[in-house]
Amino acid sequence: MTQNIQMTEMYQIILFASILAAISATSADFKVVWEVPSIMCSKKFKINVTDLLTSHKILVNQEETFNGDKIVIFYESQLGKYPHIESHGDINGGMLQVSDLANHLKIARDNISKFIPDPNFNGVGIIDWEAWRPLWKYNWGRMSEYRDRSKDLVKAKHPDWSPAQIEKVAIEEWENSAKEWMLKTLKLVEDMRPNAAWCYYLFPDCYNYGGKDQPSEYFCKNDIQEANDKLSWLWKQSTALCPSIYMQESHITKYNTSQRAWWIYARLRETIRLSHPNTLIYPYINYILPGTKKTVPSMDFKRVLGQIGSLGLDGAIIWGSSYHVNTEEMCKEMKTYVKDVIAPVASTVIQNVNRCSQQICKGRGNCVWPEEPYTSWKYLIDPKNPTFKHTNISCKCKGGYTGRYCQIAP
């Protein structure tokens, strides 16, 4: 009994100190960003969700534009002259090794000025290049053509070389070219719009397509982690990381609730491992199951957003394509899902993340539950002001603060 009283008193003291410190501290900033072309619903069918979203603290571009003041995404045809191969032929030279990087950067500069006219843009900027991968070994399936043609380029210069020699140099030339293209493009957007958080969509990946009855079975394999370590140049230069944790229909049919949580945790765990202290992390999440017109089950949406928050991350990007809003029926379904699921869940998670930050982390970081990595999301989806116990929590500190509760100034 005495011990319980002492623990209660200690908690109250820490809580009071946290509230006092919060007066002058910077609040945790958990951002949920809307990246769905819902403007199509507004224009075609007079179905608007902006007020619903913004009233629940979800960030929406002004006038619902797909690219705007909160978020901008550059697809393959929108930033410079991105070289890649399509079924109907080569685009912008096809192969990185023989394409004009200088011209690409020149045109990209104009694209950036057009798409982001405000030099003080401080939203999230995403480069979405998916036609090839920078590491040789991951250009499989339809991407294997990049490997074949890279070897052809080397063989044309050195027809007397052995296949092993050709492949060795082809790998070096491909990976060096990919690094140069990705880094110089990233540096350009960061130089031109330095206040934004910049990332490449889908990076890092975990390729964790299988798993059974243990959480560790879903973790990124050692060889995947070693490959991701080879991209250290990308993690160092990126000011944000934007992995995908899209819920698939196969996840619902193949995995139970715990397994789905393990799968997502594994991908976020790898992102955290690779991130630098000041790197922001904004995972991409979805509300429509890819390849279908079915919405993500409401409990899964709650868990996913709660997981992101409970790992101390900076927010999430809710994505949807024009395909999801091209009929009145789809627009009505979107509005219903926003009203019943997205808006209340986002509002609750944002509020709980910020409240825990103020109470436990002095407003200098976000709460993390180290001993409950797979279930701590439940604390953040509770709309009834749950109690946060400092004994269960460590803080992911920001702004140079350190210590378990960010109590040590930089």
From Swiss-Prot:
EC number: 3.2.1.35
Keyword flag Cell membrane: no
Regulation (activators, inhibitors): Inhibited by heparin, and to a lesser extent by DTT, Fe(3+) and Cu(2+). Not inhibited by reduced glutathione, L-cysteine, EDTA, Ca(2+) or Mg(2+).
Location relative to the cell: Secreted
Keyword annotations: Disulfide bond, EGF-like domain, Glycoprotein, Glycosidase, Hydrolase, Secreted, Signal
GO cellular component, one term: extracellular region
An individual GO BP term: hyaluronan catabolic process
Active site residues per record: 130 (proton donor)
Catalytic activity: Random hydrolysis of (1->4)-linkages between N-acetyl-beta-D-glucosamine and D-glucuronate residues in hyaluronate
Thermal characteristics: Optimum temperature is 50 degrees Celsius. Activity decreases when incubated at temperatures above 24 degrees Celsius for 10 minutes. No activity remains after 10 minutes at 65 degrees Celsius.
pH dependence as annotated: Optimum pH is 4.5.
A molecular function GO annotation: toxin activity
Signal peptide residue numbers: 1-25
Pfam families hit by this protein: Glyco_hydro_56
Positions annotated as glycosylated: 48, 111, 256, 392
Domain EGF-like, residue spans: 352-407
Enzyme superclass (EC): hydrolase
Chief localisation class: secreted
Family annotation (InterPro entries): Aldolase_TIM, EGF-like_dom, Glycoside_hydrolase_SF, Hyaluronidase
Cystine residue pairs: 41-331, 199-242, 206-220, 356-367, 361-395, 397-406
Protein family according to the UniProt entry: Belongs to the glycosyl hydrolase 56 family.
Role this protein plays: Hydrolyzes high molecular weight hyaluronic acid to produce small oligosaccharides. In venom, it may participate in the degradation of the extracellular matrix thus allowing a rapid spread of other venom components during the envenomation process.
Protein's name according to its UniProt entry: Hyaluronidase-1
